[in-house]
Amino acid sequence: MTAALRIALIAPNRFPIRQPFAGGLEAHVWHLTRALVQQGHHVTLFAATGSDLAPQSAQLTVRALSRSAAAARPFPPPGAVVESDHRAYLDLMVELADRSVTGFDVIHNHSLHQLPIALAPRLRTPMLSTLHTPPFTWLESAIGTTAGSGRTYTAVSRHTAAAWGRVLDRVIVVPNGVDVHRWPAGAGGQ
């Protein structure tokens, strides 16, 4: 490595990034954060409160925001987007836009939320987004509207990369970052 990078790592914010992991995405981000810090990079993690940060890493706090009575009615319909996620990612992207002149060398997005993708062209800092799932409406829409804007996308498998082929011309496959010595393959679920 020639020089340490200042990396803003955007995690999903629904569950803390800590053991026991809520799922594979949380495990991936936890292992990646530690590996980057071990290689000498400076990582700032955007994640849910209660996340287990790697030594020498910082955290961008997910602020809890209360809703007004007028905003209490669900829109979009329940299950489509969680409002607290929307507000948290909007707040984060505004903060990153303010810091983008000098704050970070790269932003690495692992969220499943559309706002980091949709607002990435407004940042001066390059953003890499890792795709962990097949396309779904909100994320596909955001990627479709920003396609061709010089953003880089990676996927955790060839299957995931192929699933995004209708929207993206190029998705680089970087195999899932979970430490297979600590998480060996098992018999599988039901």
What positions do the PLM features span?
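Catalytic cores of nucleotide-sugar-dependent glycosyltransferases that transfer UDP/GDP/TDP-activated
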Residues: 1-190
